[in-house]
Amino acid sequence: MIKRTLAMAILMAGVAWRLCGADTGPNLIAAVHPESIRIDAAYNGARVTVTGSIPSEAGALIRVLGKAESYKLKQKGRVLGLWMNRGSVEISKVPGLFLLYRPTGAGDAQSTDPPELGLESIRQGAEVVAQDQNRKELLDEFFKLKQKAGLYGTVANAIRYEPATGPLKSFTAVLTLPAALPQGAFEVEVFAIQNGSVVAKDVRTIEVNEVGLPAWISTLAFQHGTLYGTLAVLVAIMAGWLTGTLFKAGKGAH
């Protein structure tokens, strides 16, 4: 009897906690479409639509993050007036993709970016191993490479609000994803921001997969390296031969 009474008390306490917890914080509801992206031979970037609702007094920010990765790069410099490799650099604990999407007309107090959501937070968490210990300069160059590829950056005017209805307002965001998007799982983080602080958060996931020719090339490169290298050499030889043939034919026509 005592055990049964105790079990019932625990169950009722759990129900009460859930009911009370539903009203303790601001609401944020988000949906992502599509939830998967196929990279085929014709892929040249994609668009993902995020819809949802946030507290009417808050602003929205959306962040798309890839998993943390490690990069090994060659450090170049001048030696006797010539550009040469001067060592290697390893940069780790940085995401493969970092895109921050902001609302139309952003700049009010509602949508001020909290420091922990911006690119500076990625910089602070990054680890750099190099012979030249100029960490800031190395990260600056690394971020420039990522931004040039469209894999890091901030996109303005990406989120549009609907008029508030009661305590909530709806939003729609169109997220442009780069042509250089790697395959894998990416988190779509939706934040409600008020007075420069995160008051609510929702997370969704999109899956990116290579199909067709890109998938075949990746499989060949990673699982059959020798064959891939041989084919690459043959393709280069054929391309050179074809270019030379066309060039000679063009000269002969004149």
Q: What is each residue range found by the language model?
A:
Residues 49-55, 174-176:
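Short edge beta-strand/loop segments characteristic of extracellular beta-sandwich folds
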Residues 53, 63, 67-89:
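Membrane-embedded segments
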Residues 176, 199-230:
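Short, aromatic-rich amphipathic segments at membrane interfaces
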Residues 8-18:
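Bacterial N-terminal signal peptides
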Residues 236-254:
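Juxtamembrane interface at the cytosolic side of transmembrane helices
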Residues 25-43:
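N-terminal edge beta-strand
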